[in-house]
Amino acid sequence: MRRLLSIIVSLVTAISFAQQPVELPLWPDGAPNSSGLTGEEQETRPHFVTNVTHPTLTVYHPEKPNGMAIIMCPGGGYRGLGMDGEGYDMAPWFCGQGITYMVLKYRMPNGH
């Protein structure tokens, strides 16, 4: 009985983690060729990010993967990154199709 309970807890934990997005730093030890930006990221309006100093890749794994994947690079008129409408909001649709979906939060040149 104890072993069965342990297996059930492990499966439930694995399933719950499989549906959570995973945020991976692109350069854990710091980005090469720094853009010169310092300070914290700024969210100037909901999910519109500027001053990206720590780029990341957020991965959404579908429940039933079909072997395909897409990397979304949100735009924002060269002022920042629209992380919702051009990024995170589309994850449920792609994952529903079995496609692994990734959102890239990338650096931009100084002042952007």
What is each residue range found by the language model?
Residues 2-10:
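Sec-dependent signal peptide recognition
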Residues 67-76:
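Short beta-strand element of the alpha/beta-hydrolase
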Residues 36-38, 81-84:
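Short, solvent-exposed loop/turn and secondary-structure capping segments
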Residues 13-15:
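N-terminal signal peptide c-region/cleavage motif recognized by signal peptidases
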Residues 19-68:
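N-terminal cap/lid segment of alpha/beta-hydrolase-fold proteins
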Residues 76, 105-109:
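Short beta-to-alpha linker loops that shape the active-site pocket of alpha/beta-hydrolase fold enzymes
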Residues 83-103:
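Short amphipathic alpha-helix adjacent to the substrate-entry channel of hydrolases
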